[in-house]
A protein has these predicted regions:
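Bacterial N-terminal signal peptides that target proteins for export
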Residues: 2-11
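Surface-exposed loop/turn motifs in large extracellular/passenger domains
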Residues: 114-132, 147-165, 172, 177-198, ...
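Bacterial signal peptide processing site
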Residues: 26-28
Length: 518
């Protein structure tokens, strides 16, 4: 009996041991499967986050502060090589640096110039001087003339023709692929006289690439282009007249530039920005999304005629600037481009695409004539803009008579803020300030404003944008006047009430009717 019990006890122990091993293996298997599932989920989450981050990443266009931009200023006589001294009559301009409404320069991530195989029908790679030559290319992604050297090059009375479209996209916009004439790698190039003609997609006329393919804030490699007395004509889309990117420096004198394609500003900049000085000449655009000037840079223009026949007159994106001195600017914006839902002559905005840093945009105009044939004279959206006007003749031919609108449009991510500084200026029209917008109006040095403020805004597509006025702050010095053309509501008023001519209407400040007005 004892042995039988012992036998059964041993059998029981064996069964328990086998059962335990089986359970242990099963438990281990379950843990392994669970861990694998968690690892897979974690990997999936990481992949999703990485992909989302990549999709949301800025595409690396110029940073707008241009803190390290080339410091070359135009030559004193506007006739020789740049010597660092601003010419007489050429504005020094603000130090701040900043795609027209969709369809303009820029876009998604654009890689780098190191990824591009540059080709030229004629290549100049050392110091040279050529006159009366013909340069031609009908090959895609090939320039007619490629100047790639750190030396000085002079080209006189050239005939340049470029055909052969490119699908290079941002490689054309940012780095100069397929341009009729491409100047890069620290070259110091002077082009005088001659004609430059391109009839292809992505074929800018003359492209000055400063080597900094990233966002603004980094200096270029010293590439400098001086071009004078030349005729530039482009007909394809994405084909500006004179194009500056990557911190390049361009000086243009007495040019005749005509563009016909979409996204083809006669004076055009893109990723990496740069500095552009223009004195004299005629600049005309006929295409959609092709203002006469598109700024992702610091641009100064004097004594020039600027005409846009379909698009805005000029466009500034982000923390960038345009300064006009004694220019005649005319725009007839009759077709909205992509996200845009207003017609306007001066467009200041931020797309949040990464093509320009966010910050204060600056438009300054002194003297000259500003003619707006259709839409609002000024339109500010999704950015902080400063508009300086001094002795400008403003002609508003649009029936609605809107001088300035500050409100939502087709972009979001930043506020709608504008400051209008009028000095010795006569202004007339309606100021539209959306319910989530802020306008500061400063009238000084004998300025006169005839008009009112409203928050009732409908865009060109017929959609209601705002029904109530936002924040409006007005400062009126002792030499300036404001004549009302309707009951007006502002948030604050600084100045002598007697300088406000009510004209039978009432000015309300923070909801209270102002007294002491005329």
């Amino acid at each position: 009996m004892k042995r039988k019990h012992t036998k059964w006890i041993c059998l029981g122990l064996v069964l328990c041991l086998l059962t335990g091993l089986a359970l242990g293996c099963n438990s281990s298997t379950n843990k392994t499967e669970t861990a694998t599932s968690e690892d897979t989920a974690q990997t999936t989450d990481q992949t999703t986050e990485t992909t989302a981050a990549a999709a949301a990443a800025p595409d690396g266009n110029p940073s707008a502060d241009m803190g390290g931009r080339p410091d070359g200023n135009p030559p004193a006589d506007m006739g020789g090589r740049p010597d660092g001294t601003p010419p007489g009559g050429m504005p020094g301009g603000p130090g701040g640096m900043g795609q027209p409404p969709a369809g303009g320069p820029g876009g998604g991530p654009g890689g780098s110039s190191a990824d591009i195989e540059y080709k030229g029908a004629v290549k100049i790679t050392s110091a040279d001087s050529q006159s009366g030559q013909t340069y031609a290319s009908d090959t895609a992604d090939e320039s007619a003339l490629l100047i790639s050297t750190g030396d000085a090059v002079t080209i006189d009375d050239a005939t340049v023709t470029k055909s052969g479209s490119s699908d290079g996209g941002d490689s054309c916009n940012f780095y100069g692929l397929n341009a009729a004439v491409l100047v890069k790698d620290g070259a110091d190039v002077t082009i005088t006289g001659g004609t430059i003609t391109s009839d292809a997609m992505g074929a800018n006329g003359v492209f000055c690439y400063g080597g900094n393919g990233g966002r603004n804030g980094a200096a270029g490699d010293g590439t400098t282009l001086t071009i004078r007395d030349a005729v530039i004509t482009t007909t394809g889309g994405g084909s500006g007249g004179i194009m500056t990117t990557g911190g390049g420096v361009t000086y243009a004198y007495d040019l005749t530039v005509t563009t016909s394609g979409q996204s083809s500003a006669p004076i055009r900049t893109d990723r990496g920005g740069g500095t552009v000085y223009v004195d004299g000449g005629t600049y005309t655009s006929h295409g959609l999304g092709s203002p006469t000037i598109y700024s992702t840079a610091e641009i100064h223009v004097a004594n020039a005629s600027l005409t846009s026949n379909l698009s805005e007159g000029v466009c500034i994106e982000g923390k960038n600037s345009i300064e006009l001195t004694d220019c005649d600017l005319t725009a007839n914006n009759t077709k909205c481009n992509s996200n845009a839902s207003f017609f306007d002559t001066i467009m200041i905005y931020q797309s949040m695409s990464g093509d320009a840093d966010s910050g204060t945009s600056s438009f300054t105009m002194t003297g000259g004539t500003l003619t707006s044939k259709n839409g609002h004279v000024f339109h500010v959206t999704n950015t902080n803009a400063i508009i300086n006007l001094n002795g400008v003749t403003v002609v508003n031919e649009d029936g609605e008579g809107v001088l300035l609108s500050v409100c939502d449009d087709g972009w979001s991510g930043a506020g709608n803020v504008a400051t209008l500084n009028a000095k010795g200026q006569t202004l007339e029209g309606l100021l539209l300030v959306g319910s989530n917008a802020t306008l500061t109006l400063n009238l000084t040095d004998g300025s006169a404003f005839i008009g009112t403020v409203s928050g009732a805004i409908t865009n060109a597509k017929g959609a209601t944008v705002s029904t109530e006025v936002g924040t409006v702050n007005v400062t009126l010095d002792g030499t300036s006047t404001w004549t009302l053309t309707g009951d007006t509501y502002v948030t604050s008023f600084t100045g002598n009430a007697s300088r406000v001519i009510t004209n039978g209407y009432t000015l309300y400040v923070n909801g209270i009717a102002m007294t002491g007005t005329k």
